[in-house]
């Protein structure tokens, strides 16, 4: 099984969730072993997608350094993971990725337009060898060894609309596109004014966010799935784990997880060299792992 990149360059435009300004995005092919690289064209600054470059996880996953930052990368990273793409350059002319419709389906469409091609180098994956867990009170995220990677996610909100939701996701591109990619980000009406006073969520609207009041959803079209909230948290988690630089071959379990806990988990994994193995998918080893790339 070979590493993948794009066949051709594709461009798009969307609104930034936090600043509310139009953002141009370009996805470009990269050579083997380059990884996922973000580039701020307005700053002439590159940022490798990796846990060590994460500087903030409060409202989104943010890469950066003293030159600047790029926010809200997780939806795009999630789609890149689902398509099995190992090497890609993401060019942005602003400090955040566009939110599109609040899900990752627009990025999936961009990847479909770009096409995917093999490179002359074996694909590598990260195989989890022992359990790694991060907790914050009763909240936790965990990776454990497995032969068939799944995400088991539970959320619980003190809100009549959301309540407690659980979803079990089995890895495959087809399953992702059908059941995860269209799940949108969500927020609470009571938080909107506070966020905007901090110059956040200025681009948020019913076009790109599920807005929840105490006992109703404000979006006139309603939900895309009855459990869209937990499905979106899975979308986010996939994007956050992609910062490890490889498709992770392990079970991920979360109760009330977050970008912050996901970031701490990636750091804990990399800290313990016995917790994982980087496996090169040569012909002799790929059969046990190829199902997740279907």
Swiss-Prot record:
The keyword Ribosomal protein does not apply. Keywords: Hydrolase, Lipid A biosynthesis, Lipid biosynthesis, Lipid metabolism, Metal-binding, Zinc. The active site is at residue 259. Its EC number is 3.5.1.108. One of its GO terms (molecular function) is metal ion binding. GO terms for biological process: lipid A biosynthetic process. Pathway: Glycolipid biosynthesis; lipid IV(A) biosynthesis; lipid IV(A) from (3R)-3-hydroxytetradecanoyl-[acyl-carrier-protein] and UDP-N-acetyl-alpha-D-glucosamine: step 2/6. One of its GO terms (cellular component) is membrane. Its cofactor is Zn(2+). Zn(2+) binds at residues 75, 232, 236. SUPFAM superfamilies: Ribosomal protein S5 domain 2-like (SSF54211). HAMAP family: LpxC. Catalyzes the hydrolysis of UDP-3-O-myristoyl-N-acetylglucosamine to form UDP-3-O-myristoylglucosamine and acetate, the committed step in lipid A biosynthesis. This is UDP-3-O-acyl-N-acetylglucosamine deacetylase. It comes from Campylobacter jejuni subsp. doylei (strain ATCC BAA-1458 / RM4099 / 269.97).
């Amino acid at each position: 099984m070979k590493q993948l990149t794009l066949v051709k360059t594709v461009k798009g435009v969307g609104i930034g969730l936090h600043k509310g300004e139009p953002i141009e995005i370009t996805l470009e092919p990269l050579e083997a072993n380059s990884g996922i690289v973000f580039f701020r064209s307005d700053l002439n600054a590159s940022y490798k997608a990796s846990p060590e470059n994460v500087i903030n996880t409060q409202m989104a996953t943010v890469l950066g350094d003293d030159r600047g930052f790029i926010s809200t990368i997780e939806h795009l990273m999630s789609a890149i993971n689902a398509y099995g793409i190992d090497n890609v350059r993401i060019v942005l002319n602003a400090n955040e990725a566009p939110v599109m419709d609040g899900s990752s389906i627009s990025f999936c469409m961009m990847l479909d337009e770009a096409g995917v091609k093999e490179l002359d180098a074996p694909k590598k994956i990260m195989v989890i060898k022992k359990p790694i867990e991060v907790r914050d009170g009763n909240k936790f995220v965990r990776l454990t060894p497995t032969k068939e990677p799944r995400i088991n996610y539970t959320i619980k909100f003190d809100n009549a609309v959301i309540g407690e939701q659980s979803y079990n996701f089995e890895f495959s591109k087809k399953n992702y596109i059908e059941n995860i990619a269209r799940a949108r980000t969500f927020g609470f009406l009571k938080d909107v004014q506070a966020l905007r006073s901090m110059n956040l969520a200025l681009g948020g609207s019913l076009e790109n966010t599920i807005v929840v009041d105490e006992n109703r959803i404000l979006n006139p079209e309603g939900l895309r799935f009855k459990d869209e909230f937990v499905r979106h948290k899975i979308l986010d988690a996939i994007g956050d784990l992609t910062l490890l630089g490889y498709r992770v071959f392990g079970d991920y379990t979360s109760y009330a997880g977050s970008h912050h806990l996901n970031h701490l988990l990636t750091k804990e994994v990399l800290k313990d060299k016995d917790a994982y193995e980087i496996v090169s998918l040569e012909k002799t080893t790929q059969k046990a792992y190829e199902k997740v790339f279907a």
